[in-house]
A protein has these predicted regions:
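Terminal low-complexity tails and localization/encapsulation signals of metabolic enzymes
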Residues: 1-40, 73, 77, 127-154, ...
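ALDH superfamily catalytic-core signature
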Residues: 9, 238-374, 397, 403, ...
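Residues at or immediately preceding the N-termini of alpha-helices
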Residues: 32, 46-49, 68, 101, ...
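Residue-level signal for inorganic ion chemistry
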Residues: 35, 71, 93, 115, ...
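Conserved C-terminal structural/oligomerization subdomain of aldehyde/semialdehyde dehydrogenase
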Residues: 36-40, 204, 228, 263, ...
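Glycine-rich loop-to-alpha-helix module at the N-terminal edge of alpha/beta enzyme cores
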Residues: 36-126
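Short, well-ordered beta-strand elements within core beta-sheets of diverse protein domains
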Residues: 38-44, 58-65, 154-155, 262-265, ...
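Rossmann-like NAD(P) dinucleotide-binding subdomain of oxidoreductase/dehydrogenase enzymes
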Residues: 130-272, 394
Length: 481
């Protein structure tokens, strides 16, 4: 395995109450590609967590009164600050997450957009004028409904999008006037700390953002802390639902796992659908909750689609994430790649066929296409979170819908058809948070509502929708007589 391009190793402190604090248990972050040292930091203690909550409470007295134009200005400055440091962010994401550099740049661009949209939404948190004269006894009465920020919130983020999924917590919180205690993923905390530098420079008040790499016990104590008014969590279903039980009275926003299905009907160009499924299934080694995992193709075009899909997958280049030509880098760890390879072996032992891929080299798993799978196999019924897709034929469109729905998850699904009736049938019957027409499940633009049903979570992200989660309506009833 060739070595990744070396970069200077930086020491990172905690970001606590507007200060960079070099305290706590030291840790090192290593590249999942070649185990090269990427950076060093400190794991926060229970005392740091307590200080962060106090800081967030104190800063909230400032942010809840901050006018919308000022929140807009800060968010625009954050967006511009990320853009100015695009290469620095992209390289750090590639190193600590193993994401191919060109994919990392796309993530940075998305984060720039996320904060820019949040800046506009900060000025659109509107209220409502509500007439109350619906009965004779209430003539002359009316009401105003206005949204107020909840207060300090707790954000827990995953490794796979260490910038943009953090942005999806921080940007709407700042737009709403909430303060934040952020626990980044232990595999990728450095990108969050770099983002904290940008937010600090943009003028968000001290204590308004606290970034603490925390061990699980300290993080769980924060989850149960009633001074934090909302938990926004993105990660695995098992962890998310367990945290919900510990969250007490606070609001909970969960963006959890997926097992995304795609339907390819015969009236859509098979080559085009295959091309999109290659990108949607193997970008960032399939480590996204909306990555294409299960593909159901109408039998009349099944072989044509499969041939095109395998040809496209075989063109993908695996390797060093800092190499501009790399399409698929490592998984987040060798253990993760080993687990995914074991699932492939289990499927093959049960009769599945490897059409391409299937081999592992350290943390890199070859992009893999499986056929002759069925629901009970782990590669089909669980979230694979790896560069693996299953392709199966169907005869009747309703059967394809039933196959997609035969999952504990319901995040997004893709439907390739030009038949409007079939499309709206899918829209009505698919048990998911989002149906993507003419594209794969992995499509997401950052201002759209995003979230799932069943085991895939609670609530919605996507700036305006997250702001609604982070604010609460308050009524002023008026007697105007």
């Amino acid at each position: 395995m060739a070595a990744a391009t070396s970069v200077p190793v930086k020491n990172w402190g905690l970001f606590l109450d507007g200060q960079w604090v070099s305290e706590g248990e030291p840790f090192e972050i290593h590249s999942p590609f070649d185990r090269a040292l990427v950076g060093k930091g400190f794991r926060a203690t229970a005392a740091h967590a307590e200080a962060a909550v106090h800081a967030a409470q104190r800063a909230f007295e400032i942010t809840k009164k901050m006018p919308s134009y000022e929140r807009q200005r800060i968010l625009r400055a954050i967006s511009e600050g990320i853009h100015i440091r695009e290469q620095e962010f992209a390289q750090l994401i590639a190193l600590e997450a193993g994401k191919p550099i060109k994919t990392a740049r796309a993530e940075v661009d998305r984060a720039v957009f996320t904060f820019a949209v949040a800046a506009e939404e900060a000025t659109r948190i509107s209220g409502e004028w509500l007439p109350l004269d619906w009965q004779p006894s209430t003539v002359g009465r009316a009401a105003i409904v206005r949204r107020f920020p909840l207060g300090p919130i707790l954000a827990i983020t995953p490794f796979n999008f260490p910038l943009n999924l953090v942005a999806h917590k921080l940007a709407p919180a700042i737009a709403a006037g909430c303060t934040i205690v952020l626990k980044p993923a232990p595999q990728t905390p450095l990108t969050s700390l770099l983002l904290a530098q940008v937010i600090e420079g943009a003028g968000w008040p001290a204590g308004g953002l606290n970034v603490l790499p925390l061990a699980i016990p300290e993080a769980e104590r924060l989850v149960g802390d009633e001074r934090l008014k909302l938990l926004t969590f993105t990660g695995s279903g098992a962890v998310g639902w367990a945290l919900k039980q510990k969250a007490g009275k606070k609001k909970v926003l969960l963006e959890l796992g997926g097992n995304a299905g795609v339907i390819v009907h015969s009236d859509w160009d098979a080559d085009d659908a295959a091309r999109r499924c290659v990108e949607g299934g193997f970008s960032y080694a399939g480590q996204s909750c909306i990555s294409v995992q299960r593909i159901y193709v109408q039998r009349s075009v099944y072989q044509e689609f499969l041939t095109a899909l395998v040809a496209g997958v075989n063109k993908l280049k695996t390797g060093d994430p800092l190499d501009e030509s790399t399409d698929v880098g490592p998984m987040i760890s060798e253990d993760a790649a080993r687990r995914a390879a074991a699932w492939i072996e289990e499927a093959v032992a049960a009769g599945a066929k490897i059409e391409t891929g299937g081999k592992r080299n350290g943390s890199i798993l070859e992009p893999t296409v499986l056929t002759n799978t069925w629901h009970e196999l782990k590669v089909a019924c669980e979230e694979v979170f790896a560069p693996i897709v299953n392709v199966e034929p169907y005869d009747d469109f309703d059967d394809a819908i039933r196959c997609v729905n035969d999952s504990p998850y319901g995040l997004q699904a893709g439907v390739f058809t030009r038949d409007a009736k079939l499309l709206f049938t899918a829209f009505e019957k698919l048990e998911v948070g989002g149906v993507i027409a003419g594209d794969v499940s992995a499509f997401r633009i950052d201002h759209m509502p995003y979230g799932g049903v069943k085991d895939s979570g609670l609530g919605r992200e996507g700036l305006r929708y997250a702001i609604e989660e982070m604010t609460e309506p308050r009524l002023l009833a008026l007697n105007l007589q």
